[in-house]
């Protein structure tokens, strides 16, 4: 994909002129018709891709009216989905999945038009030269700020004469997980480039985008992914609106335009190292909570407080489930109590509830996990105290009192720092972070030494 095409996609002006389009049913043999014809795939002003194809042949009323069988609240059955193959005027073979066509009949009963929204398109092409390494380029639309560490020299040459020279700071270079990374900021997009001697597959691409979103505390959607290896190039293009800053949630490390020490990218590498072994094409369990917290910053402060509390508890349960809890004495006492209750002539339902309660005493609560970590000097007791106050009020639906707004803000900030500290422990990170629980937001050092 050339630079003009990339610019057109980022400006929502891209179109694919197709000499042949084929829409095939996802489940053959279900009576769904295959549609063929020429047409156009074009971007709408909001970044979506719209298919318009012109077909010939008879069409049944069932194909036109099939949507009338759908019921509100029910997931659309997969038999109604189609697979698209398209040949453009340059000979490239595009593919798209999970398409639901809309059919429009004309006055000529042997001709009809098909419209469809397309979420993602892809094509593969051959290269002349063999590229031994694996490379990936991910394009994110929008004005996305990152800390830079590399300048670019810009020269203005007129008639062979150098009229002026300047330096532009818009690139970051760093290494992580035996890969080389480079981020480049353009006017309307950010590009994340990765180079590796081992396979870069779809799950690893997800982990890379998660790492970037984590260190920036921003939800990001990509528009283009280009993968190159051997003599093959694969390009994926996706409907995506411009990424804009909506959340007030601050990143783990506050950054300026320049980051010569690469502290932000060190955290990027630590998260990637911890999560890259997760091979499902889903968000990593840690990132599910990170994403929830980032998105909570787009809502009210009360909503953010509640989600921060839930995310902290969920993260503790997911990542520290194997932490030793409960003394041998407690376990012995519970076993003795169970024995006594079992001998009593109690009604079965009541007895089962009491025994269940005793069993739960051996299952640590989120608060128990926090105190275990506190006893090992891994988290700050003051952060736990502020988190407890925030969690209790949020869980019981208590709205923030406007007269105590500063107190509520401070508790949210402390809860966010605690949330980040738990992530640091989960990924094994030691290094700088920004303490939003302290006025002035000083930078401090975190250590995961002593992690159980």
Regions inferred by a protein language model and the residue ranges of each:
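Short glycine-rich, low-complexity/disordered patches
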Residues: 65, 218-239, 350-358, 433-440
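Short N-terminal signal/transit or membrane-insertion segments
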Residues: 3, 15, 101-114, 239-250, ...
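Amphipathic, oligomerization/interface secondary-structure segments
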Residues: 245-452
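Internal, Lys/Arg-enriched amphipathic helical interaction segments that engage polyanionic partners
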Residues: 199-274
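Long, contiguous, compositionally biased segments that the model treats as domain-scale units
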Residues: 1-215, 219
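A generic structural signal for solvent-exposed, polar alpha-helical segments
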Residues: 20, 55, 76, 100, ...
């Amino acid at each position: 994909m050339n630079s003009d095409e990339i610019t057109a996609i980022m400006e929502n002006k891209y179109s694919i002129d197709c000499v042949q389009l084929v829409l095939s049913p996802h489940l053959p043999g279900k009576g769904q018709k295959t549609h063929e014809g020429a047409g156009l795939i074009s971007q709408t002003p909001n970044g979506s891709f719209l298919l318009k194809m012109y077909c010939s042949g008879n069409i049944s009323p069932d194909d036109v009216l099939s949507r009338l069988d759908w019921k509100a609240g029910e997931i659309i059955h997969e038999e109604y989905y189609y697979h698209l193959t398209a040949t453009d005027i340059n000979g490239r073979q595009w593919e798209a999945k999970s398409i639901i066509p809309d059919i429009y009949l004309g006055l000529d009963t042997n001709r009809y038009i098909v419209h469809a929204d397309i979420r993602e398109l892809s094509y593969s092409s051959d290269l002349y030269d063999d590229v031994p390494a694996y490379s990936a380029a991910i394009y994110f639309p929008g004005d996305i700020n990152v800390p830079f560490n590399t300048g670019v020299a810009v020269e203005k040459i007129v008639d062979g004469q150098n009229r002026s020279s300047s330096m532009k700071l818009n690139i970051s270079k760093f290494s992580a997980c035996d890969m080389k990374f480079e981020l480049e900021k353009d006017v309307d997009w950010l590009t994340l480039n990765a180079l590796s001697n081992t396979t870069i597959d779809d799950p690893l691409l997800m982990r890379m985008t998660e790492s970037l979103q984590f260190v920036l505390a921003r939800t990001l959607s990509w528009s283009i992914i280009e993968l190159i290896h051997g003599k093959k190039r694969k390009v994926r293009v996706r409907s995506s609106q411009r990424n804009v800053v909506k959340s007030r949630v601050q990143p783990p490390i506050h950054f300026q335009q320049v980051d010569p020490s690469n502290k932000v990218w060190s955290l990027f590498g630590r998260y990637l190292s911890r999560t890259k072994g997760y091979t499902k094409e889903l968000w990593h369990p840690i990132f599910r909570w990170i994403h929830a917290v980032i998105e909570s910053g787009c809502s009210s402060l009360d909503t953010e407080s509640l989600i921060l509390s839930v995310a902290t508890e969920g993260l503790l349960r997911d990542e520290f489930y194997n932490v030793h809890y409960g003394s041998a004495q407690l376990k012995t006492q519970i076993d003795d109590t169970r024995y006594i209750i079992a001998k009593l002539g109690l009604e079965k339902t009541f007895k089962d509830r009491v025994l269940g309660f005793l069993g739960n005493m051996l299952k640590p609560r989120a608060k128990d996990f926090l105190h275990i970590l506190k006893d090992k000097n891994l988290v700050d007791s003051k952060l736990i105290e502020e988190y407890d106050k925030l969690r209790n009020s949020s869980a019981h639906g208590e709205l923030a009192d406007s007269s105590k707004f500063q107190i509520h803000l401070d508790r949210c900030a402390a809860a966010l720092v605690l949330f980040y500290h738990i992530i640091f422990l989960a990924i094994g990170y030691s290094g700088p972070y920004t303490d939003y629980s302290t006025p002035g937001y000083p930078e401090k050092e975190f250590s995961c030494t002593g992690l159980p």
